[in-house]
């Protein structure tokens, strides 16, 4: 079979480019593709890393990037290397603009429906729901990503966000003085990421939750020393196993998920070399 390298470059989650790539590859049964994912490329420093990899691993480039300067840099670089650089929805947007007489404002995301990517996303969402909050730990081998962290560190919404981007994500809470699942003693292929937060901020979030639930007695849940120990213990667990840790104190769900996706795809790209 003929090998084909495809670089998927996006300022978002690469799902649009990935969907287009899979739909196109379905027309070629004799091709053996190797896809490199480059999500959340939103500045020149991140793009430099991508360009370096494109230079060392020549292949077709599919991109969805809204920033004009980044697009110019990418297309010029590929032109000089004499490799195809294709805007996945650029032609469509241009024709819509010409036909309607309305100027282009920005590139919008879109999805091909009912292709492999669509069903991968549905499966990932189902997986995230069934493996929320430490459920079905015997099925962690089917995950792409495992999140660990104290309660209320945005593990569940981050898992769902990642699932909407096609990544099967399980999450496991860490509770002070409770035994942690023995999976941490094993070598696993999945990306494990620890989520921590400023203890004072976490106490605020937990107190708000207790008030909403009208629960008055749960001292350990909002005790500063215990909350601090929970975060420190998660850091310790991750550092001992070289698992990345993300402080979510000032990050939105999207920002946290973007960091995790970047780590995940960097790891995947590394093993695809």
Curated annotation (Swiss-Prot):
- Please tell me the species this chain comes from: Rickettsia bellii (strain OSU 85-389)
Q: Under which name does UniProt file this protein?
A: Putative pyruvate, phosphate dikinase regulatory protein
Keyword Kinase on entry: yes
Task: Show the InterPro entries listed in the entry.
Answer: Kinase-pyrophosphorylase, PPDK_reg
Q: Per its database record, what is this protein's job?
A: Bifunctional serine/threonine kinase and phosphorylase involved in the regulation of the pyruvate, phosphate dikinase (PPDK) by catalyzing its phosphorylation/dephosphorylation.
Q: Which reaction does it catalyse?
A: N(tele)-phospho-L-histidyl/L-threonyl-[pyruvate, phosphate dikinase] + ADP = N(tele)-phospho-L-histidyl/O-phospho-L-threonyl-[pyruvate, phosphate dikinase] + AMP + H(+); N(tele)-phospho-L-histidyl/O-phospho-L-threonyl-[pyruvate, phosphate dikinase] + phosphate + H(+) = N(tele)-phospho-L-histidyl/L-threonyl-[pyruvate, phosphate dikinase] + diphosphate
Q: Which GO terms describe its molecular function?
A: ADP binding; ATP binding; phosphotransferase activity, phosphate group as acceptor; protein serine/threonine kinase activity
Cite the entry's keywords alphabetically.
Answer: Kinase, Nucleotide-binding, Serine/threonine-protein kinase, Transferase
Record's family? Belongs to the pyruvate, phosphate/water dikinase regulatory protein family. PDRP subfamily.
Q: Where does ADP bind?
A: 149-156
Q: Name one Pfam family in it.
A: Kinase-PPPase
E.C. designation(s): 2.7.11.32, 2.7.4.27
PANTHER family in the record? PYRUVATE, PHOSPHATE DIKINASE REGULATORY PROTEIN 1, CHLOROPLASTIC
- Which HAMAP family did the record assign? PDRP (MF_00921)
Claim: Kinase is one of the keywords in the record: yes
